[in-house]
Amino acid sequence: MGANASNYPHSCSPRVGGNSQAQQTFIGTSSYSQQGYGCESKLYSLDHGHEKPQDKKKRTSGLATLKKKFIKRRKSNRSADHAKQMRELLSGWDVRDVNALVEEYEGTSALKELSLQASLARPEARTLQKDMADLYEYKYCTDVDLIFQETCFPVHRAILAARCPFFKTLLSSSPEYGAEIIMDINTAGIDMPMFSALLHYLYTGEFGMEDSRFQNVDILVQLSEEFGTPNSLDVDMRGLFDYMCYYDVVLSFSSDSELVEAFGGNQNCLDEELKAHKAVISARSPFFRNLLQRRIRTGEEITDRTLRTPTRIILDESIIPKKYATVILHCMYTDVVDLSVLHCSPSVGSLSEVQALVAGKPNMTRAEEAMELYHIALFLEFNMLAQGCEDIIAESISLDTLIAILKWSSHPYGSKWVHRQALHFLCEEFSQVMTSDVFYELSKDHLLTAIQSDYLQASEQDILKYLIKWGEHQLMKRIADREPNLLSGTAHSVNKRGVKRRDLDMEELREILSSLLPFVRIEHILPINSEVLSDAMKRGLISTPPSDMLPTTEGGKSNAWLRQKNAGIYVRPRLFSPYVEEAKSVLDEMMVEQTDLVRLRMVRMSNVPDTLYMVNNAVPQCCHMISHQQISSNQSSPPSVVANEIPVPRLLIMKDMVRRLQELRHTEQVQRAYALNCGEGATVSYEIQIRVLREFGLADAAAELLQNPHKFFPDERFGDESPLLTMRQPGRCRVNSTPPAETMFTDLDSFVAFHPPLPPPPPPYHPPATPIHNQLKAGWKQRPPSQHPSRSFSYPCNHSLFHSRTAPKAGPPPVYLPSVKAAPPDCTSTAGLGRQTVAAAAATTTSTATAAAAAASEKQVRTQPVLNDLMPDIAVGVSTLSLKDRRLPELAVDTELSQSVSEAGPGPPQHLSCIPQRHTHTSRKKHTLEQKTDTRENPQEYPDFYDFSNAACRPSTPALSRRTPSPSQGGYFGPDLYSHNKASPSGLKSAYLPGQTSPKKQEEARREYPLSPDGHLHRQKNEPIHLDVVEQPPQRSDFPLAAPENASTGPAHVRGRTAVETDLTFGLTPNRPSLSACSSEAPEERSGRRLADSESLGHGAQRNTDLEREDSISRGRRSPSKPDFLYKKSAL
């Protein structure tokens, strides 16, 4: 579908006939040749003094040439001014900001390409070949029967005679209507299906069946010798139109007064009638088909057959002018709209021509003729003729015809496709339009549509300037209309003497421009000290200052050109070509000059939340274009109309639309638009949705069909991207609001096995993966799929990334087993925020207690908040900036509880499993100042946020039966910068590394600590207090110092809330692994140290020294407040 929308303007060239050179000359110059400015329109003659007119002509031509030079120079200076203004704006910018602006322009350019394709989309018109195939299949108006192997084939005499010399000779012997001709074919091997395929080929030029015998050259040669080799279908049909052999219908034109005479038997001259074939006109036009079938039902056709006279069709010339009849028939036979075949004599029945003659207007232009013919095509239901007229009108768009075409296409009977092309011309040539007189004839609606476009080719200063001029002109017209009739046309009228600017009423001018000025992007006006802007503000037309003049919370000035530095609602700059080219030029120069800065990572931020409440209210990107109006339980049937006026199409058409939508999504152009417009995926999806709707002939208001198809077809499945509709509880899907704790992102396990096509995401801070990392992902178990919730086509996001978690509810304190990670409290829950009570359960030897503890721990793991999985870096960044000014020396009491290692087989301790597998890539960013150490026995790797592979989309909740990878597997448990809520991968929390202990000693070492009312854990009397002194400015070590006499260790512990954490930030800070990822050791050194650590406890001091050295290496890159911080501070 929509093949005609991709090759404009070349798509219209085959349909438009006539002289191509004359058509090219017509565009933009037609009004002059039609209005008497040609060579033949000589208004006067001079018998004497031929030299004076020649001299005057020379002087005029010389002055005109000089004027053109000045105009050309002024235009070039204007373009140079735009480039100079953009260069001055970017003079003080950083190279990253210029790069961000250029990327914004590239994203807008990709959207413009999709918007252009959508504006060119329209339903595919039926071609001559398709209509002839339907004619052979449905047997409209057949007049002869072919008998072959006792099978009757009704056919059309004129088509077979024009296509095949064999049938021309055969049918000439039986000229009567309905003759039966027995076929005797000498070629061997011709059966009934093959004969039917031969007839189908004569009608369409293609074989209708896939038969291997048609690949045999010998059979084709024998058929060509017997039947002859036909020409192409276009050539033979053109010959049939020219000679009209075996015609069986005539078209007569008359006014209402002549209809009685026509029926009374008064025949017009045959030269005044047009001959045609019933088969062709019934195949191409449903209007003529229904007319001829009605004549057959009423018996009128039998009379014509008895008298052997052609069928006469009388048309009202006031509806279908006679001069267009030849153009209509020519298009029916050839699929080409050729206005050059118009009859020389005008039709007196044409109402528009009568009005033109009365008004004294010149002859109709080519565009006006195409407009009138377009209405006739719609009346005849002849889509090929209608689209050909649309192409002619679109080619005729110029400054002279723009207003007339815009007005005509705006009417209900006008063409929406032509209206989109006229608006596109207005936006592309707006700089030329606003400096001409045509600009003041534009209506407010057309002007409003133009200035709302992101692709308007004009600077904001010129838009504001000429909008005010347009408003002043409209106000002068109002004043002229209000003046008395006695002054109209006199020297005292407003049109003659004019109105001074100071005499205009500002209130009335403001009322005229009130609906237009809000769409002028004042923040993007260049130069910044624009006189046009200051004058408009002095006159009171603009009351609010631009947002870049307003101070932000950081005390500086915002940048309205950049998305991440905008103070308010971001409005992207228009894709003005001089600005775009100059910005790219400046970026190239800066990248050459600042090579060192370019090597740094340029992080693109798009729609990044700037406050914590926006992180809390975050929803999947696909949801903000969906209405989610699900079918209620009391509603018996789905809706039958869309947008209260458009009927819902049939299911087969709906499936074709969804298939076409998926096909467009996988194209390179759409994927590029998705990649360049991160965060604007809904806009990209909407462009391709309205393109599909227009290709299927539906209005743009029916976009909900593709955004939420399950609302209209609840029992159907539309491809891989559309699960079945489920009955959802109220409040289950909430857009831009805080979801209730009980219903937030529940029942999403089904999307684990759901992999829609995705655009390539941006790759900021992506840690390199290892083969072991992928093996661990592949080892995750997949949950059984449950019922799918409603899914939209607005944005192809991956719902498998949102894992199933439920909000914590009131109940007994959870118990953590050594094999389960201690989850931080859910900051998105309103109940018990920051007051999560945690207690260590006393382990018993009974299996019942162990099973109960395992169930409680599994429930706690499932209560991990979805927030930190969605946007971990954003949440941690917010908590970091809110705590960076509150750093005070504190006496941190070590509240960590120690538990013995769970029973395991012989081998190295599990807390040493990550020592030989530390990652050698050491570059990473630290978001927080207070790093808490969290341990667990079973290290677990979370799926990467930017990894959309099948192995990555697995549930992250560990099962109790999962096996911990041994150290020989080389599992990588380094930091995942997009999973900050993980616990540390090792159980190392003291200053020394203990050896293996017996299970009996481990059982004796288990203790239980009660909680105090203030939330801190009580210690036993024999346990010393561990102090962690923080200096000023604090550079806290990541490893707490433990007393050497404390020999009880355990891989699982619970982290309490420290003094610097608040209710809003508790649980958002990342748990930094106790073993740093920074390591520069050789493999030999690491293996040697691993053996030494596993042998005895005497190397604890050496290990502590190595850890402190690694911590000092990574400390320089940890604090965001350092002046030599390598990464640019974000908009947070």
Swiss-Prot record:
Q: Which Pfam families match?
A: BACK, BTB
**Where is this protein localized, as stated in its record?**
Nucleus
Polar residues: bias regions = 1-10
Sequence ranges of Basic residues compositional bias: 918-927
- Phosphoprotein recorded as keyword: yes
Q: For this entry, list what GO says about its biological process.
A: morphogenesis of a branching epithelium; regulation of branching involved in salivary gland morphogenesis
**Listed GO CC annotations:** nucleus
Task: Keywords in alphabetical order, please.
Answer: Developmental protein, Lipoprotein, Myristate, Nucleus, Phosphoprotein, Repeat
Region feature (Disordered): 1-24, 897-1019, 1035-1132
CDD domains for this protein: BACK_BTBD7, BTB1_POZ_BTBD7, BTB2_POZ_BTBD7
User: Cross-referenced PANTHER family, in alphabetical order?
Assistant: BTB POZ DOMAIN CONTAINING 7 (PTHR16064), BTB_POZ DOMAIN-CONTAINING PROTEIN 7 (PTHR16064:SF5)
**What is this protein called in UniProt?**
BTB/POZ domain-containing protein 7
| Organism of provenance | Homo sapiens
Q: Which gene encodes it?
A: BTBD7
